[in-house]
Regions:
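Alpha-helical cap/lid subdomain in secreted, periplasmic
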Residues: 4-16, 32-165
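A short beta-strand-loop structural module common to alpha/beta enzyme folds
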Residues: 14-29
Length: 165
């Protein structure tokens, strides 16, 4: 969806100067993202950081407190040089209601704490449809990418509009 985002930004505003840098690493956790963030911020000096991490923390059953702390720190670092937008994810129900709800609540809690925009669920509209996932049932297919972008776009568009003011 990130490559599609580049095209949508260009189509949306012919005069835009937005440069999209995809610094994601498949399988990364919030710890990995946080470890790399300072160098990325120094190198690219972004106006807006979109933080979409945590799924692998949850799938591995890692500490939710640590995940929350790392997301908070990433938002703090991003906001120190620009703005941030948080992208939430949900876990499959087999992780138990208590853990999955606590996991999902982290995103809204962090967004509220820092007064930043939130995309509540990246996979909204596709999460329960096998046709949109690879064999592992974790990674979306190419067919899912436009839908994912559509999930992010309304929040991102408003955020970019506010940054342009």
């Amino acid at each position: 969806w990130v490559n599609l985002l580049r095209h949508r930004l260009k189509d949306h505003n012919k005069n835009n100067s937005w440069n999209v840098v995809n610094a994601s690493i498949s399988g990364d956790t919030t710890a990995g993202g946080l470890a790399r963030l300072a160098n990325l911020l120094n190198k690219y000096k972004p106006v807006l950081c979109m933080i979409a991490l945590g799924a692998n923390n949850g799938l591995r059953g890692q500490s939710l407190k640590l995940m929350r702390d790392e997301l908070n720190e990433m938002v703090r670092q991003c906001n120190s040089i620009g703005s941030s937008l948080l992208i939430g994810i949900k876990l499959p129900p087999n992780y138990g209601e208590k853990y999955t709800q606590a996991f999902h609540n982290i995103y809204s809690d962090v967004a509220k704490q820092h007064h930043i925009p939130l995309v509540p669920f990246l996979l909204d509209g596709i999460a329960l449809q096998d046709k949109f996932f690879q064999q592992d049932r974790l990674h979306p297919t190419a067919e899912a990418q436009p839908i994912i972008l559509d999930n992010v776009w309304p929040v991102l568009e408003e955020t970019l509009s506010n940054l342009s003011k």
